Amino acid sequence: PQAFDEDLHVENVGGKVAMIELADNLKEERSQSLSASADVYRRFGAFQINFLIEGFYTKLSDVFALTDGEVVDGVLIRTRHNAPGARVMGLTLEGKMAYLSLLQLQAGVTLQQSRYDEPEKWSETAPAEKKIFRTPNTYGYFTATYTPIKPLSLSLSGTYTGSMLVQHMAGYIDKDVAVNTRDFFDMGVKVAYDFKLYKSVDLQLSAGVQNVFNAYQNDFDQGVERDSGYIYGPAAPRSYFAGIKISY
């Protein structure tokens, strides 16, 4: 076992600096995995279709977990230790479709379950949890590209993240609590047009919107006693962009 880069980052929890140290007897995580899949390709005239189904199962032994921590010289020290184990299992469905060079679609969804073998005690004031934190039971994505004429392309993409359990440490709030977050659908749209400047020089102009529906966390902590680790969902709210690219 070794310290990860993120372990060296300093967090702010309840007005205290929080850091992670490794337990003296920390053992490496071990996993045993099994998966099976079926993949089908078919052509129907000008349409090409691909469908994939995959099941997976992973058993984790000596899984890493964090204590709620203790304050030493004004610094909250959280210790990474080994929990008894955990299991992750689920099913992935993925499909692709193409119609000539005019339209391309791709989408996928994963249904999964992530559980500790025994409830994990993560706080002195909050109940132990058997569900692994920050692991939604459902997540998925899609992409679509439409090219009505060769220089012009219209793109649509999105990701879906289901509800998940997230730790919220005391400070800004009165006591530690495990929060069931809402689900998020983050969709983006982009328009691009290619111009031929010279024999081997192309110019592309593009513009679009990211996170069209403004699916964004709305309960951030504030002030000096905030929990800086209480962040989830899409990384940015609705935003607009434009770009220029020259290739040769």
Model-derived segments and spans:
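C-terminal beta-signal and adjacent terminal beta-strands/loops
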Residues: 59, 151, 159-170, 193-248
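Outer-envelope beta-barrel architecture signal
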Residues: 45-51, 101-103, 138, 150-152, ...
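Gram-negative outer-membrane beta-barrel transporters
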Residues: 50-59, 79-170, 213-216, 245
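Extracellular loop and loop/strand-boundary signature of outer-membrane beta-barrel proteins
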Residues: 19-25, 76-82, 122-131, 173-179, ...
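Solvent-exposed loop/turn elements at secondary-structure boundaries
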Residues: 4-29, 34, 48-50
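Residues that define the transmembrane beta-barrel architecture of outer-membrane proteins
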Residues: 30-34, 85-89, 136-140, 183-187, ...
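Membrane-embedded beta-barrel scaffold of Gram-negative outer-membrane proteins
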Residues: 27-81, 87-89, 204-205
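Outer-membrane beta-barrel translocator domains and adjoining extracellular loop/strand segments
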Residues: 2-10, 16-17, 63-71, 112, ...
